């Protein structure tokens, strides 16, 4: 059988002894039924008995103490594990705790002659304390020893239970003993390396273990011997001492108790005390909280071992330490004792404000949802630094949980028990949540080496049925069960009493029946159903893919939150489910595919400023958060590359992040609230959406247009689904061979639109004299767009422009200087919006103008201009007034004292009238060209140039206007 640690022995033995030891059953009955009336609140000064197993405390009267001692003595003789302490109070026997560091790994012999010498020296200090009463008294000394030395450490206790003295007296005696040269010499002769510091000064007041009890996960100290010393105050120099005979015939739990006053062997001797100097020691409410937590929580025991694998930098360096604390806090609020224990591994930091820092950090953890790391990270760190030890601990953890069930339920295992162990095994790899239809849905974290689709690695994959768990139960779980069989057979081979051997025989028989069930399909389905409740992580589905700066890519997860972008191709705790199959590789302009695409972009969009602006705009498709309210309308007569570019963006991002949209979304009337709209739902969670191939003269629905472009929440639903609310996060492009008709004068709509007209045409036989005709290459449409190398290269280009946009323009498209698109947008608006055309041709900004126009005067001027230049029609003054208030003149309109709207700071030109000094057209010149210097192509590396009106690039020869 594999060697089991004492910790594992504790947890298994505690469960088993309740089954086959009548003495343990009787003790538990006594505590639960008869002594429960004496329970106290943790920390109460009335407490005299502490049960470490349950954490319960008692204030037992002397008669009940004797009953408890009797039961504990019977359990001790049967070898039962016990964890009882007595509180010393203000007046009790003396306990000396020696913690030895040895020169070797072997325990010192501590023969009776050595212990007798120690008795004499200890009594000298007691006598010198002047607290012994007059008369003749028998004083008993007991020595209990640690069962074995562990890594050069050893210990023993000296118990003088009958000598009742105050805590202050004990402290005085201990203080003088610490400097006793004779005691130090005796210990040094026994191979003790720290004789001057091995006596624990706190042993005067801390709770003391009752004999036969132990600290959790430690073996109990064993009685080596006892001495009886006779002291007579009339002859203080004559102190006979002899070894106690037949010591095992007494109730040793009772006799060695520091507070018992009714022993058969040990009779109390009451020492003098300075009552005024006494202060009753307090028992903290969380005393031994880590030990109790580890006893009752198998996962806490498991994490305790895992944390021990982390190297020192994890508790010395603040960033790593804070991550461990956050991980524990996010895993369970009950794991605070683990965090304290781990923090104390660095005494220097703990003793200089460490507790206060931990307190603050622990409280912060519940509020910092963006730092949602859990025990999964602790597992990863431990495996990274100590893979072999990690594997051994993990396997032993499964064994302990299963063993506890086997021993608790006499070898019979049911669905939930197996599911509990499976959860311990696979809880870091699988998660269950309930979807919007009320169904339990499984998610698996996909790791390298397992079957997967391209792009699923390092992400949470949705599973219809967790087939890996089904296989795992039959193939891997059986190995853990074999260890249980091995463990039971080991105990059957030991020289136990008949009743204990019979217990193990029945246990093995029942367990063998349970083992065969894990190969049964129906039984495994039952286990999986129970596992759903254990693996359930509420709201997990709602947290998936909510970070707009994270994209699932073919080779991991790409974070664009920092510049440069970071590829996460290892363990992480980001809840990512969606992905594109494209692998991220850093931008490299020397890559042949990247060169090909950069040259193609130069051909498709010949104007440098427009090319850069469009690439900046398209790069925002990789970000799925709220964006600037913009939509690009791309006009082109065909064979100009716009469709190739838009489709390439969509193919690179994949269906999870991009969608081709039905043009009817922009052109049809909005559906009523109760009707579904699957086309609109295609925008949910997408970073990119595009329209293409419209009919001639399509009229856009401006209310739908504003809804789709504006950042913020919208509502819609799929067929047969509930109404959903989601944010519009898509970068929108609408391409057409014909201009869209936008029948609105609303400036709020127009300022969200950008318009670009393609100039280039790709032909089979291009005109060599026309620089806007290029040689067509069918491979772009039929081969390149489908090639993974091409797609990977284009994705790197998008990421490059995203990073450039963040670094140079703070992520804001509107800051990118682009006179080409601005002038074309202005011209397009004027062709659609006659009111805007009137304003840009006839209304000028005139700061020195004294004339103030009533809004009705502006309405009249527009109506006259419209009838003269467009068409004669009847105008409705109220409608025109409202349109003017929503136009670009909005910022020039003010309220007059009589509460009417006036136009101030502007002048309305008459036909053929020119500008006066200091005046300027509102935004554009009379010919529709922006009042900025046009820019031209730089000689090299166009993608590196940053559009800036104050620093135009080095010019080449201007291209002719098509």
UniProtKB/Swiss-Prot annotation:
Residues 607-775 form the SF3 helicase domain. This is Putative primase C962R. ATP binds at residues 636-643. PANTHER family: ATP BINDING PROTEIN-RELATED, SF3 HELICASE DOMAIN-CONTAINING PROTEIN. The keyword Hydrolase applies. Its EC number is 3.6.4.-. Induction: Expressed in the late phase of the viral replicative cycle. Keywords: ATP-binding, DNA replication, Helicase, Hydrolase, Late protein, Nucleotide-binding. One of its GO terms (biological process) is DNA replication.
